[in-house]
Amino acid sequence: MRVSVRLCLPWVVNFFAKIFMPCIPSLHTARSTSTFTQNFFAPLLDLLIHANHQRVCPELTDQDWLCLGVRRAIEGRPSGRAFLQHLALSGVEGPEHSHFFETLKSARRLALVSEVSTALAAGLPPLPGDWWKCVPELAAFDVYAGDGHFHAAAAHDPRDAQDGCKDAVGHFFSLDLRSHALGHLTAADQVTRRKEHDMHALKRLGVRSLRQGAATGRKVFYVWDRAGIDFRQWHDWKHGGGLYFLSREKENMKLEVIGENRWDRADPRNAGVLGDELVATSQGVSVRRVRYYCAQRGEEFSFLTNECTLPPGVIAHLYRLRWEIEKTFDELKNKLGETKAWASSANAKTMQAHFLCMAHNLMIRCESELEREHGVRNEAELARRAKRLEKEHKRLAKEKAVMPFLVQAFQRLTVRSVKFIRWLRVQLFARPHHEPDIAALRHLFATL
């Protein structure tokens, strides 16, 4: 007989979870697994102990479900059936096909996954060697890059009655530019809109969700592409919620200069700044416009923001960093192979997005620990980057130009390499009962 025990009070759940969870046979964290595998998933299980939405379900425990979802995200199998078949061929006793997909529909499991995913992202430490010490003005800000990301529909999603096509599945994400933690903001509306606009989704979220748990008095700064522009909404968010936005000027915008802002031309961070202006918009509010010349690309850019205190060169560089969320989407799609929805239900699609975030964030933790504890770095890629920088310095010198100060100060690898992901898959899933082959990864990072 199948039994599922539901305990509603969080403190009761925590009490029984601490007693029973270590005794429930876990397919992913059993005693026979390596210390490396246990450490990789340990952050999820530590957060699970204190989660409000956990339940004692012996048939498929919450800890197994979390580990199973992350494994599904990292392994890159083309379908759920292929993933479950691979589990069976690997000697792992996974859930039945129907049970796996029914669990993806569960509202309670979605609430749990969302809770753990959000906590994991919030607890990710800043990446080492970043440039924030060069900009003390940002100490009072949480800084995110935000954007929408779409992938193919699920195999059993319905087709449109008019054109016979399936609508793409969209999600809106944020990337913490300090820690590179990926967070899920919301799934795109697939009921009333075929492709929800970014600003419509942001308005639907509201101030509380966009602040992502920031303390009262702390400012939250989003860098978004042109789809995130709504000047009236920017004004309301700034004065009602401490939210600030940065984007690029659209070609068809008619903005009137109504003032000039003072800025320090001697500050090396402002190299390339052409102007710092206050402009009037057609929506009856004014915004700040920073005009900037990028010596590396030989182009002029205009940035718009409702933040008026940061140096203009910092504003320009923050928009440069927006590209990192695009690189993260490329990591999900082309390196992890996540190109379509796992299932048709709205809960399943949202749960998939959270599992992708958890996989990304756990890989960052793993990569940082390997460097800190074993001195393993992607030396080959670092050497290639150094050569590119040297070549760029020489090119700019011939043109009697210099590389911007903040670009020189801020150099870091922004995505996980394919060779790291391949190595990780072997350690976690092909050799889960053996300690990791650190020497093999060091060799990969040094030569390929």
Predicted features and spans:
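A short, flexible helix-boundary coil/loop motif
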Residues: 12-51, 56-59, 135, 258, ...
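Active-site-proximal, Lys/Arg-enriched surface segment
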Residues: 101-177
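Short amphipathic alpha-helical "interface-anchor" segments enriched in bulky aromatics
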Residues: 315-343
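Short, charged amphipathic recognition helices of the HTH superfamily
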Residues: 74-89
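Basic, amphipathic alpha-helical segments enriched in Lys/Arg and hydrophobic/aromatic residues
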Residues: 343-367
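An internal, acidic/charged active-site-proximal segment
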Residues: 116, 187-299
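Short, conserved catalytic/metal-binding motifs centered on acidic residues
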Residues: 68, 83-84, 95-101, 143-151, ...
